[in-house]
Amino acid sequence: YEEFIFDPTAFYLTKYLPRVLGIFDGMEELPYLPGLHYFRLVGGMRAFAKPRVRAALEKIMKAAEEVERFANVHVEFTNRMTAQGFPTSHISTSVAPYDLIADYFRGATGTMKDLYRNKDELLEMLDKATVFLTKQTIAWSRASGHPVVFFPVHWAPDRFMSQKQFETFWWPSFRKLMINLIDAGIIPMPLWEADCTKRLETIRDIPPGKCIYWFERTDMVKAF
């Protein structure tokens, strides 16, 4: 928590990405860039000549070229389908801040323990995650030219945490993210997976007509 909260970018480049993506192996040898200054800026560039860092950068560029080719095929397909009268419901996707942490950093067991053992750190990380998720989601949506952003909701269902915990840890950051997107002219479209009936009263606190709610399984009478 401490490293991520202090400098998420450094944590991503030197810790997280080398662990989850093989092409980033070697990036942990990068210097702590914000500490470079004056002649240290020049000297610090030596790190990019290290064999493992050079190999990582070459792999990253090669992978990026493949992703670019895939993206171009996807854009061409989407445009062709739209021209034939089948526009996509959405192009961009994003994730709730709590789900980002639970799915990709701490895991189910770790995050559930954090609800009791690391409350302050979890809340601070949620605040930080909300900021960069807002920026990245707006950028993705505008680049796609489609105003709807899809959110698969993983950790909001009734069985995963108490209502008090939901209102403390899960909902505030997601609501803030959705409001930020709405203010930017974007339409959030979360899919509330599993049963979220107990959450209905809370999640109604959003500007009417500004988002689309999907429900996998809930009391639709109460939902309406």
Language-model-derived ranges and their functions:
Residues Y1-F224:
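Catalytic cores of TIM-barrel enzymes
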